[in-house]
Amino acid sequence: MKANTYKKKSYKKLWVTLAIIAVLSLTAINFILVYINDYYKANEKALAALESSDGVEVVVDENHSVTFIPKHITAGLIFYPGGKVEYTAYAPLMHELADNGILCILLHMPGNLAVLDADAADGYAGQYSNVTDWYIGGHSLGGVMAASYAAKHADAFGGVILLASYSTADLSDLGLAVLSVYGSEDGVLKLDKYV
C-alpha cells in the first residue's frame, strides 16, 4: 500500500512540476511576443521614401532588406536599424543619402531587434563590386551591432557611423574612422558615460 501511495505522490509531483513549467513557458512566450510586437512604426513619410525616384532606385530583396541605389555611386553604407524600430522608418534618411551618391542597404531585422541577427550584413557588400568604399552604421542598438560587425570585419569597411549609439567593441586599433552623432537633449543615451 505504501508503494502505491509513494507512486501517486511521485506522479502528482511530476504533473505539478510539468504544469508549472508549461505555465512559465507560455508566460515567457507571451511576454516575448508582446515585447517584439510593441515597436515604433514607420510613418507615411517613411513609407513614401521606399518608392524609387528619378535619381534613386529602391530594391527590396528576398530578406526584406531595402537597397537604395543612386545613379552615380560614390560609396556604400550598410545600416542596422535601432531596437524596436521598424526598419523602414529609416527610409527617408537612406533615400536622402542615396540622392547624394551613397548606395544604402537598410537591413531588415527579426523582431525589429538587430541583436537577433548581428551578422545581417554578410554578403551585401560583395553584391556591388562597383562600390569600393564601404561604411557600416546603425542607430541605437543597431549601431552597437554594426560596430560589433565592423570589429570582426574591419578590412571590409572604411568607417563606422553611430547614430545615438556606441561601440561595445574596441575599434581604436582597427584603422576605422568613427563618426558618432547624438543629440544634446537625448533622454536615453547616458552622455556622461559616452566619451
Regions from the PLM with identified roles:
Residues 94-114:
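Conserved alpha/beta-hydrolase
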Residues 15-33:
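Hydrophobic membrane-insertion alpha-helices, especially the h-region
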Residues 137-146:
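Gly/Ala-rich beta-loop-alpha elbow adjacent to hydrolase catalytic centers
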Residues 174, 180-182:
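Short beta-strand/loop motif that positions the catalytic acidic residue
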Residues 74-82:
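Short beta-strand element of the alpha/beta-hydrolase
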Residues 93, 189-195:
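Short alpha-helix in the alpha/beta-hydrolase fold that links the catalytic acid
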Residues 107-110, 161-169, 183-186:
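Active-site nucleophile loop of the alpha/beta-hydrolase fold
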